[in-house]
Amino acid sequence: MEKYLSVTTLTKYLKMKFDKDPYLERVYLTGQVSNFRKRPTHQYFSLKDDHAVIQATIWSGIYQKLGFDLEEGMKINVIGRVQVYEPSGSYSIIIEKVEPDGVGALAIQFEQLKKKLTEEGLFQERFKQALPQFSKRIGVVTSRSGAVIRDIITTVSRRFPGVDILLYPTKVQGEGAAEEIARNIARANQRDDLDLLIIGRGGGSIEDLWAFNEEIVVRAIFESRLPVISSVGHETDVTLADFVADRRAATPTAAAELATPVTKLDVLAHLQNQEKRMVTAVRNVLSKKQEALKKCSQSVIFRQPERLYDGYLQRLDQLQLRLKQSLRTRISDNKQLVQARTHQLVQLSPVTKIQRYQDRLGQLDKLLGSQMALVYDAKVAEAKRLSEALLMLDTSRIVARGYAIVKKEESVVDSVESLKKKDQVTLLMRDGQVELEVKDVKTKEI
């Protein structure tokens, strides 16, 4: 009778076979990356060829040490172990080591970082700085013992003696080299007395030159305030430092030549040329001045110098005449002004004023006397006239002349209209008075 196995039993059996099979403990496999999507931790994807596919896993610790990123379609060679995953009954390879097929890992890492930094714009020409024509002090980031620093010092001293070289001794390959290169670039930028910076090393393999391909070094060069010349490896060697530097030199000697574009001989030649130009210019000026002097010496003024000031003598005579006339006019005007002011002072003198007031007072006194006499005579005549008028109005004088006066209640009656029948009136006469009663009132016809 046949015995049936459960799926779990069969899967466990296959897992045991896979785990104990020495050929599956370390498998060398080549294939093409498929279904790859980068994850923040472990990486899960497929390896395939033209006829088969196997699932693959790379733990995060191993993937971070690769130095490059896997990409869809990339051909790789891997070393790992094959295992069975029981829940799904599938098998996969756990990868422990990865190498690109045909192209080295560093080459892929180089291209990937180059692409990334290019997209950020770090290699654009607009960020390149111009190198100074004359540098007083040049900083060099390289090894203390290498031939690079010797070549730079020799070339700079030959081309332009007096330029200072400041060396920043730096580890240029191996572990920690990239960090030290970036750190010394930053140190150099903290100084105010440097004009230029050269970074570099001699030739070597891509591994030897790799520190100059590290992102930390590339960004340090990009952020440098100082212009940077990169001289890494030989002419055929190209690093990312070369792309980001302001200028690239194939050799240390070429870097030193770029750092001193103007040589001592160039300066001397320039000075000699300037000297010749100055001498020529001075000679031309002297020639022109001599010619001008010759013309002046031959002019009429120098042959008959008295003509030089004839016009001025005439002008002087005219000015003297005008001055005399002006003085006479000023003196005459001042005399008249003094006379006028003297007359004003005399008129304003207190003695003059008192005398004038006394004369006026005498005139007024005489006028007042005559006027008072006239007024007195007029008043006397007026008084006489009024006195006579008063005498005429005196009732005793009236009745003495034979007239009688009628009074009613102590008032003189001067019209019949003020009387009526039976009014009691008094009749005043020269020698007495009579009491009467009005019998009748008759108005006189006019």
UniProtKB/Swiss-Prot annotation:
Gene Ontology biological process terms in this record: DNA catabolic process
Catalytic activity: Exonucleolytic cleavage in either 5'- to 3'- or 3'- to 5'-direction to yield nucleoside 5'-phosphates
InterPro entries for this protein: Exonuc_VII_L, Exonuc_VII_lsu_C, OB-fold_nuc-bd_dom
Parts forming coiled coils: none
Molecular function terms, GO-annotated: exodeoxyribonuclease VII activity; nucleic acid binding
EC number: 3.1.11.6
Any single GO CC term annotated in Swiss-Prot or TrEMBL for this entry: cytoplasm
Pfam families with a match to the protein in the record: Exonuc_VII_L, tRNA_anti_2
Keywords from the UniProt entry: Cytoplasm, Exonuclease, Hydrolase, Nuclease
Compartments, record wording: Cytoplasm
Subunit: Heterooligomer composed of large and small subunits.
PANTHER family: EXODEOXYRIBONUCLEASE 7 LARGE SUBUNIT
Summary of the function given for this chain in its UniProt record: Bidirectionally degrades single-stranded DNA into large acid-insoluble oligonucleotides, which are then degraded further into small acid-soluble oligonucleotides.
Family: Belongs to the XseA family.
The name this protein goes by in its record: Exodeoxyribonuclease 7 large subunit
Organism, scientific name: Streptococcus pneumoniae serotype 2 (strain D39 / NCTC 7466)
